[in-house]
Amino acid sequence: MATFKVLVLMILWITSIFNVRCEKFVTIPVNCSGEVDIDKMDVMCPNRYNLLSTNHLMEGEEVETFCRPSLRENDLLDGYLCRKQKWEVTCTETWYFVTDVKYQIIEVIPTENECMEERERKLKGEYIPPYYPPTNCVWNAIDTQERTFITLIEHPVIEDPVTMTLMDSKFTKPCNPKHNEVTICDTYNPLIKWISKETSGLNLHCQIKSWECIPVKLHHSHRNMMEALYLESPDFGIVDASKICNLTFCGYNGILLDNGEWWSIYRSGFTHGFLDNHILKNRRIEECKEKKPGYKLAKLDTTYIDLEFEIELEHEKCLGTLEKLQNGEYVTPLDLSYLSPSNPGKHYAYRLEYINTTEHKCVQLGFTYEGGDCRKMLDERDDHGAYYNWTTIKLQRVIRAVCYYHTFSMNLDESKHKYYDQDNRSIQIDEKFISEVLKSTPLIDRHEKYEGNLSWNGIIIESKNGHEKNVIVPSASQYNHVMINKILKRLDTVMYDSYKFDSESGSISYNKIVPIVREDNLQNAHRVDVIQYIKDKGSYIINGFTGWFSSLGKLMRWTIWGVGLFFSIFTLYKIIMILRKHSNDNVRKEFKETAGKVMIGQPIDTKSMSRTSIKANNKGKFDKVKDLFTPRSKTISHLTTDTLKEHTDGTYEELHFFNV
């Protein structure tokens, strides 16, 4: 669909270009006065100047400054997300010296004054990043330390140059900026506010100090202020004020040209305010309806340079006409048209009057010089003199007048030349206009004979049968080149589409930012700190363990641990020794009872018994003796004897019972 629209627009523009090519613009004097006869040496070429130039001002013209936004800047307005937070540290220490430290950030709704004060501190370089206060742990108590901070996070938003509203995915609706004040906007999250960085309320795109400015020449078609107003500039050519409309862009009043370009008037105070008078008093310029501002693409425009070249070429042709005129050569209507200015205004106009004269020349042959008059035939001689004559055109008068030139258009498709005044449609070239304005003399040519008169600056007035008249204007106007390029400039203009805010999704065209906080998850808006999130996932045990190695009771706890460890080891050692001694006494007692039974001859069935005892030997050392008693032999046998280096407390015995 978009491609189809582009093709339709291109076809319309090309059709307009063809229409312009079928139309020719010429300059014709409409009011002449002060006719005088002058010498041919006094004929001068007109002062030609570029129609789009603002360096040459004629009577009734003024220059104003027009500006437009630069395409290098964006539509972002700098600002901050303002949040009020309490950074809190809670230390809980039990009576048994277990410490638990809890870190958390609590979100609080900030006030506008708090955000504005923090903004001032940040702009002055006094901004302090938030931090947790130092921990203060007290035995068998809960201590809470907190610091309140206003945090500012840089976050630019979009400012629509057409509606001058602020848009962002975090806003519930477009926000209106305040000029020369700090702008504060609400967001979906009631705990967060947006505050502007600057007080101008304008983004870089809409700051007129960075705009591109050009001089524009303004003039009326007539002295009457109610008549048509024209704007001329090297950048956008010639624009009729009746084809523009008022449109506000970036908060500034401006005009929208017929090719779609938007310009703002940046007046310096030295002008008469032609455009303001035209807008306010005449009410000729209406408000734009359903039109979008546009800007021209960065492209080199050669219209101004082409006109400069044409001016130099026209001036060279005019100098050639003066040379022929001063040399006494015949000046054709085309040569005379180069004396006509190529732009409207007050200039001289020239009309030449020629007459037919008869010239003769003597043809002298032999002996004819003796005769006093070569025109007399000397028939009595063989050789005679003679002469010949001919009819020629001779310049009789050069008439000059002061005229006001208007620009006329002519449709080339019509068989008869019809001219229409571009400034005043009421002016028509009819018989009255020809007789009163286009004063003429009979057109005389030395080769062709036809009815016609020659008027100002080579304008030819043809008449057939003395009734039907046709006006031929050989001069040209700079509008021929300007109007064609004016249509072509529409192809270089791009419309500026404004931003669209979707209230349901919070999204903005050209800015696909997904909202961070929505209405459906506002209940979790305070869960913003990482420490609280980690603690909820299992850091309680870690904090309890690390609490032992922190707080003011650290030294006391290590001392108690050391004393407790010493007493625990000593107690365990004593218990082991007591249990070992008690075990040895039981074994010795049981062995004695068994040995007594063996000595008195009591049978022990099929069980054999072994005994290990410690006995002193003759060398003053102790031997470890293992005795084996068997029921068959009824005897005790010494199996092994080991010599011990030392003896501990009491007799060491081991009893082993097994079946035989």
Curated annotation (Swiss-Prot):
Record family assignment: Belongs to the ephemerovirus glycoprotein family.
Biological role stated in the UniProt entry: Attaches the virus to host cellular receptor, inducing endocytosis of the virion. In the endosome, the acidic pH induces conformational changes in the glycoprotein trimer, which trigger fusion between virus and cell membrane.
InterPro entries documented for this protein: Rhabdo_glycop_CD (IPR055447), Rhabdo_glycop_FD (IPR001903)
Superkingdom to which the source organism belongs: Viruses
Keyword Transmembrane: yes
Entry comment on modification after translation: Glycosylated by host. Glycosylation is crucial for glycoprotein export at the cell surface.
Organism from which the protein derives: Adelaide River virus (ARV)
One annotated GO biological process: symbiont entry into host cell
Signal peptide as annotated in the record: 1-22
Keywords linked to the UniProt accession: Glycoprotein, Host-virus interaction, Membrane, Signal, Transmembrane, Transmembrane helix, Viral attachment to host cell, Viral envelope protein, Virion, Virus entry into host cell
Full protein name: Glycoprotein
